[in-house]
Amino acid sequence: MADTYVGSIDQGTTGTRFMVFDHSGQVVANAYEKHEQIYPNPGWVEHDPIEIWENTKEVVTRGLEEAGLDAEQLEALGVTNQRETTIVWDEASGKPVHNALVWQDRRTTDRVEEIQEAGKVEMIREKTGLECDAYFSATKTEWILDNAEPLKMQASRGGDVRDRAEDGELLMGTIDSWLIQNLTGNHITDVTNASRTMLYNIRELEWDDELLEEFRVPRSMVPEVRPSSDDEYYGHTDADGFLGAEIPVAGALGDQQAAMFGQTCFDEGDAKNTYGTGSFYLMNTGTDAVASDHGLLTTIGFQMSGEPVQYALEGSIFVTGAAIEFLEDVDLINNAAQTAELASSVDSTDGVYMVPAFTGLGAPHWDGRARGTLVGMTRGTEKEHIVRATLESIGYQTRDVAEAMEADSGIETTSLRVDGGAVKNNFLCQLQSDILQTDIVRPVVDETTALGSAYAAGLAVGYWDTVDELRDNWQVDREFESEMDSADANTMYDRWDDAVERSLDWAQEE
């Protein structure tokens, strides 16, 4: 009998990855495809949902072929995804009425300020655990319903989009819903993705009528909410479809919650930080939805079938890896790997600070009008100083969140599990440890986002029996301990606060 595995579709901000894992959590197949980033106006970011679905089929097919696997060898499929990114589509045709509005998109900032001025921020925070921000799906959905021109997509029927939504003809969802719909024909999301819409009550665990009314989103549009690991399955792939097999789709988590699951942060106080386009620091708070007084989000960490929801505190940092991409865009570096060499060639930034607020600042500042700032330059400043300042900004932003996390939870983080593409950079990991004054632990399998959704799906179908098996799979690649004097780290961090102040409230209303 052929060996069996679990597959994971990891749909991210810049591309789509398909990975297959064996029982020990090791990677046996891996394929990736980038998709286009669409910038119609300053501060606007879109993706083409059709391109994402086509790429998904491509990477799944190619990943299996290159590894010499048959689809029938997959016991389950899990899905993980860039969160908050929002799609509205025609239920009958399955075609989107507009491009997806990406989590980074800031076009609804004015609407958010309207809500803030109306004094509704506290109500939203109490129900959803979220700051009222353009980051989340609620204002994105509202914008699409008010502004989409579906005929431009050459894919969906014309007619007033809002009227059609009110008539029950349109569906909305985050990327997981879009993929699950295309994989199984069912309109489903999981609790972690629902918790990022700003429409879902994380304490009552249901779509909130008051919020649906506030953002004028008809209840008929929203997906059914299910556990992250669901032994009743979300559905099966079509035997006559692109895979040619009926495979249970049984696990889904937003990418950051999936990384937490893949890092086996199953216990209260466990924390991880994922370094991607942005950085996302999550701490498991158990069955208690801890309210934040320090600009963090209260969110759902995960839910297993038949078990209570596990909550988390989250610090969402909008720009970390994207700051490295910026250095490439302006030709300061040729590729990301070059950053360590350039940054380590100087002892310090020589007083230069980079605040990479290209799309505003997330936790704990929440300023949609903050903008990227480079301060402290002199005629002696060289590109090496700017590159180092950019890497240091990742550490400072992480410390902003770590200090807020400790204040809210009362738990001191002595060890932080890290993952994501950037953690392959030893210099960056050491820098993080120095600035945070905390041990940084890098696991052997660093694609923990894909691993987390595979674990969720595999648990649902019995491929793994307990989370203890998953804990046994987790292995340390390297641990980084601080080599910097704490007084020096604190002095540098205090100066970072000054730099952040200069970036705030910069963008003017149009």
UniProtKB/Swiss-Prot annotation:
ADP binds at T13, R17, T277, G321, G421, N425. Glycerol binds at R83, E84, Y135, D255, Q256. GO terms for biological process: glycerol catabolic process; glycerol metabolic process; glycerol-3-phosphate metabolic process. ATP binds at T13, T14, T277, G321, G421. Disulfide bonds: none annotated. PANTHER family: GLYCEROL KINASE, SUGAR KINASE. This is Glycerol kinase. It comes from Haloquadratum walsbyi (strain DSM 16790 / HBSQ001). The gene is glpK.
